[in-house]
């Protein structure tokens, strides 16, 4: 076998070994449960959290209340997201799922954002919502939008920019599940115009084809 062939086989083997790492999401658990704790005492570090000693795990480690309480929507965007993830429900650790309640004021919105680690499935509990997501550059940045009423369900694919807007004159409520114990969130406007420190306004002016002073005004808002 030639040196060239050996080099090709070595590169192919390396690619095969790294491919599972590239496509992986939350790893599957190798135990019944791993209740997340923030201290290492009597714990094992798994998936970003220390596991609570199974001998002192109780039902409350898998319990969260208060999703029946409306969130405060008195803010600039007119919405509030109440999150149930591994940070406030330790029993979710390694289970690859989390939940949110979203409250919308009349004409409020959950502004364009993305979850870098999760797909989201949403069901409307109250009101009427305009929802949608935008596909990637490779797909031509197509908008997929739908008006949802009570009981309707919509899916937002992992990593894609999406939004919800309350079309009604009364408050709206939705519940959403995400395919990660900690999905993460990147709100587009806050990230671009509210970064710390600011992105050079000349960069954003060129990217958005805007006047530099208009960019500075937007940055001042965030």
Swiss-Prot record:
Q: Which SUPFAM superfamilies match?
A: RmlC-like cupins
Instruction: Name the domain of life.
Output: Eukaryota
Q: Which residue positions does the secretion signal occupy?
A: 1-24
Which InterPro entries does this chain map to?
A: Cupin_1 (IPR006045), Germin (IPR001929), Germin_Mn-BS (IPR019780), RmlC-like_jellyroll (IPR014710), RmlC_Cupin_sf (IPR011051)
List S-S links within the chain. 34-51
- Cite a single GO MF annotation: manganese ion binding
Asked whether the UniProt record includes DNA repair among its keywords, one would answer no
Residues recorded as binding Mn(2+), renumbered to this chain, are: 113, 115, 120, 162
Q: What does this protein do?
A: May play a role in plant defense. Probably has no oxalate oxidase activity even if the active site is conserved.
Major subcellular site: secreted
The record's subcellular location field reads: Secreted, Extracellular space, Apoplast
Glycan attachment points = 80
Which residue intervals define the domain Cupin type-1 in the entry?
A: 65-216
Identify its protein family: Belongs to the germin family.
Arranged from A to Z, the UniProt key words for this protein are:
Apoplast, Disulfide bond, Glycoprotein, Manganese, Metal-binding, Secreted, Signal
Q: Could you name the Gene Ontology cellular component terms for this entry?
A: apoplast; extracellular region; plant-type vacuole; plasma membrane
Q: What protein name is recorded for this chain?
A: Germin-like protein subfamily 1 member 8
What interactions and quaternary structure are annotated? Oligomer (believed to be a pentamer but probably hexamer).
User: Does this entry carry the keyword Protein transport?
Assistant: no
